[in-house]
From Swiss-Prot:
It comes from the Viruses. This is RNA-directed RNA polymerase catalytic subunit. The keyword Nucleotidyltransferase applies. The gene is PB1. Signal peptide: none annotated. GO terms for cellular component: host cell cytoplasm; host cell nucleus. RNA-dependent RNA polymerase which is responsible for replication and transcription of virus RNA segments. The transcription of viral mRNAs occurs by a unique mechanism called cap-snatching. 5' methylated caps of cellular mRNAs are cleaved after 10-13 nucleotides by PA. In turn, these short capped RNAs are used as primers by PB1 for transcription of viral mRNAs. During virus replication, PB1 initiates RNA synthesis and copy vRNA into complementary RNA (cRNA) which in turn serves as a template for the production of more vRNAs. Influenza RNA polymerase is composed of three subunits: PB1, PB2 and PA. Interacts (via N-terminus) with PA (via C-terminus). Interacts (via C-terminus) with PB2 (via N-terminus); this interaction is essential for transcription initiation. Interacts (via C-terminus) with human PKP2 (via N-terminus); the interaction competitively inhibits the interaction between the RNA polymerase subunits PB1 and PB2. Belongs to the influenza viruses polymerase PB1 family. Residues 53-82 are annotated as: Disordered. Pfam families: Flu_PB1. Keywords: Eukaryotic host gene expression shutoff by virus, Eukaryotic host transcription shutoff by virus, Host cytoplasm, Host gene expression shutoff by virus, Host nucleus, Host-virus interaction, Inhibition of host RNA polymerase II by virus, Nucleotide-binding, Nucleotidyltransferase, Phosphoprotein, RNA-directed RNA polymerase, Transferase, Viral RNA replication, Viral transcription. Its EC number is 2.7.7.48.
Length: 757
């Protein structure tokens, strides 16, 4: 039977059908190949928006830099980055006037954070540019490498373990005439295999010392590595995102802490809150505008879009903002906060892997690394690429492009939100001094603007004034992509408002289904997603029940664990049937062991093991939850685990789910192929860290200890702890005299070895 899809919508109010137009089903698009082209686009575009600025040359690195600040006022509607310092400062002053004490209080809060933050804050985060190896690494490894290099170059303030002291080392490192680093490299050689007598390539990993002069080190310290942003839906073209190195990260963290503290106190800020809290905040602003627009007044809302927000922002403006916000604060604090924008004014963008060429006739492929783009003959490239390279050449130094204007994606979300809110704040009648007034919401580059006025001319005048004010601060509202409606219908950060927020359910679609972590976690996450959507996203009981049945079906197909009494044949069905027949209480079997599903929409909050515990056979309980079972790598499982959910837009969300450690909570082993690459040295380092930490936690099982800092104290702490524990055990008769003597001997040997080293 053919169903006419329009029939589905006969009973649905139009605004609820919005979610069906979102591109969120199916797999999102991923990028392949290099991001070099996208990065060059970003660099060239950013310079084009600021082209009427002043060119200077960085005295330390020799990089050409473009400064658009206080540049010509725009005469057309083209996007531009010519922010006016005095306007930004005035906007800040008015923001403070409407919120007395806001900057002062946020500075005090931030100062406290600065003094308490430990350096391991920087281990959070995924890929980070590792300047010692000149490529991306997991954050923890990149930090460890940086600290190792700092220490071998005589920079030791970081040993206190405070982030602020690590940053002192960063500052000192920039004054050094040279830095010595250790790099990993591969040697390949052809050798004959004794068994097969064939020639094989043997790879060995070496480490070599390398000296960087001041200029090379500064370039690396100021480099942002670039990648292509993956899994972006609803876009035809990919775009580049940046990941900064460890030198910049700590400074950015403190600036964002200050800005976050300010945003929390601003009613128009959509950050740092999210979810229902954000919806409540937004609804408040709308309510205020609707109740204050008397019967005589019109109220309109713009669903706003800004053109290339990041590329028109400027770190120099952020420096001006910070200088103003911290004006009455101690010198050291002002200095710490001003370093991030200064580093960003001198940043370099690494162009990525370069280009891949292939010759169809000769079956050859060759990689042109980014470093060669400055000198290579352009006849090999197509027109568009040739234009890009020609444009970017004057900016190139060692495979990186000088990029002074613009902020790369996602670096100063909070601070740029403060800038946006400062314009919304200017819409109060006491500032507009006329009949129109405005208010709105700002979340990074996304905004909604509500304008009230006695008539349509007033609304138009208000929008125009807002538009021009934005231009003065380097913000470009897109006239093509923004649209205006009577207040009551608008969209903001993918929340659709229609006399209240409409659930945009399609955005949650990607999180339904089996996550693929392991049988235990997947069951738990699957039901938690359904539960959360019933709470937050208007998922009704009937639909939820259906979602649950589909999930169980999906789960059984994924793990081939169909019920023990089913006819479906899979690789596991022989084992599962055997278990089914031996089990007295079949309802007690987990779904992943071929048991029935006992979940319904009322008990989604209970972990499956708990739900079925009373129904299980005793020997099944014993096997399922046996910590001595050799097949389980039991991590110490906390009662609440975190899964990283990728919602359809915005950052990955942490989702909590209940976890019960069973034989189904396995952790897959690492892929072997990494062991043959130059990453192997890094992997060994990581395992060494892991082993040391595990050993340390064996000695100090309580989680209440403060981590000791510096390598010496760890060993000493473990030795002294071993001696104390051994004495207690010996005196209470838990160990024999010989064992006690042996432990003491081992402790002395360890200390002796440390002294010799």
């Amino acid at each position: 039977m053919d169903v006419n899809p329009t029939l589905l919508f006969l009973k649905v109010p139009a605004q609820n059908a919005i979610s069906t137009t979102f591109p969120y089903t199916g797999d999102p698009p991923y990028s392949h190949g290099t991001g070099t082209g996208y990065t060059m686009d970003t660099v060239n575009r950013t310079h084009q928006y600021s082209e009427k600025g002043r060119w200077t040359t960085n005295t330390e690195t020799g990089a050409p830099q473009l400064n658009p600040i206080d540049g010509p006022l725009p005469e057309d509607n083209e996007p531009s980055g010519y922010a006016q310092t005095d306007c930004v400062l005035e906007a800040m002053a008015f923001l403070e006037e409407s919120h007395p004490g806001i900057f002062e209080n946020s500075c005090l809060e931030t100062m406290e954070v600065v003094q308490q933050t430990r350096v391991d804050k920087l281990t959070q985060g995924r890929q980070t540019y590792d300047w010692t190896l000149n490529r991306n690494q997991p954050a923890a490894t990149a930090l460890a490498n940086t600290i190792e290099v700092f220490r071998s170059n005589g920079l030791t303030a970081n040993e206190s373990g405070r982030l602020i002291d690590f940053l002192k080392d960063v500052m000192e490192s920039m004054d050094k005439e040279e830095m010595e680093i250790t790099t990993h490299f591969q040697r390949k050689r052809r050798v004959r295999d004794n068994m097969t007598k064939k020639m094989v390539t043997q790879r060995t990993i070496g480490k070599k010392k390398q000296r960087l002069n001041k200029r090379s080190y500064l370039i690396r310290a100021l480099t942002l590595n670039t990648m292509t942003k993956d899994a972006e839906r609803g876009k035809l073209k990919r775009r580049a995102i940046a990941t900064p190195g460890m030198q910049i990260r700590g400074f950015v963290y403190f600036v964002e802490t200050l800005a976050r503290s300010i945003c929390e106190k601003l009613e128009q800020s959509g950050l740092p809150v999210g979810g229902n809290e954000k919806k409540a905040k937004l609804a408040n602003v709308v309510r205020k505008m609707m109740t204050n627009s008397q019967d005589t007044e019109l109220s309109f809302t713009i669903t706003g879009d800004n053109t290339k927000w990041n590329e028109n922002q400027n770190p120099r403006m952020f420096l001006a903002m910070i200088t103003y916000i911290t004006r009455n604060q101690p010198e050291w604090f002002r200095n710490v906060l001003s370093i991030a924008p200064i580093m960003f004014s001198n940043k370099m963008a690494r162009l990525g892997k370069g280009y891949m060429f292939e010759s169809k006739s000769m079956k050859l492929r060759t990689q042109i690394p980014a470093e060669m783009l400055a000198s290579i003959d352009l006849k090999y490239f197509n027109d568009s690429t040739r234009k890009k390279i020609e444009k970017i050449r004057p900016l190139l130094i060692d495979g990186t492009a000088s990029l002074s204007p613009g902020m790369m994606m996602g670096m100063f979300n909070m601070l740029s939100t403060v800038l946006g809110v400062s314009i919304l704040n200017l819409g109060q009648k006491r500032y507009t001094k006329t009949t129109y007034w405005w208010d709105g919401l700002q979340s990074s580059d996304d905004f909604a603007l509500i304008v009230n006025a006695p008539n349509h001319e007033g609304i138009q005048a208000g929008v125009d004034r807002f538009y021009r004010t934005c231009k003065l601060l380097g913000i470009n509202m897109s006239k093509k992509k923004s649209y205006i409606n009577r207040t009551g219908t608008f969209e903001f950060t993918s929340f659709f408002y229609r006399y209240g927020f409409v659930a945009n359910f399609s955005m949650e679609l990607p999180s339904f289904g089996v996550s693929g972590i392991n049988e235990s976690a997947d069951m738990s996450i699957g039901v938690t997603v359904i539960k959360n959507n019933m709470i937050n996203n208007d998922l009704g009981p009937a639909t939820a029940q259906m979602a649950l049945q589909l999930f169980i079906k999906d789960y059984r197909y994924t793990y081939r664990c169909h019920r023990g009494d089913t006819q479906i044949q899979t690789r596991r069905s022989f084992e599962i049937k055997k278990l089914w027949e031996q089990t007295r209480s079949k309802a007690g079997l987990l779904v992943s062991d071929g048991g029935p599903n006992l979940y319904n929409i009322r008990n989604l909050h209970i972990p499956e093991v708990c739900l079925k515990w009373e129904l299980m056979d005793e020997d099944y309980q014993g096997r399922l939850c046996n910590p001595l079972n050799p097949f389980v790598s039991h991590k110490e499982i906390e009662s609440v685990n975190n899964a990283v959910m990728m919602p359809a837009h915005g950052p990955a969300k942490n989702m909590e789910y209940d976890a019960v450690a069973t034989t189904h909570s396995w952790i897959p082993k690492r892929n072997r192929s990494i062991l043959n690459t130059s990453q192997r040295g890094i992997l060994e380092d990581e395992q060494m860290y892991q082993k040391c930490c595990n050993l340390f936690e064996k000695f100090f099982p309580s989680s209440s200890y403060r981590r000791p800092v510096g390598i010496s104290s760890m060993v000493e702490a473990m030795v002294s702890r071993a001696r104390i524990d051994a004495r207690i055990d010996f005196e209470s008769g838990r160990i024999k005299k010989e064992e006690f003597a042996e432990i003491m001997k081992i402790c002395s040997t360890i200390e002796e070895l440390r002294r010799q080293k």
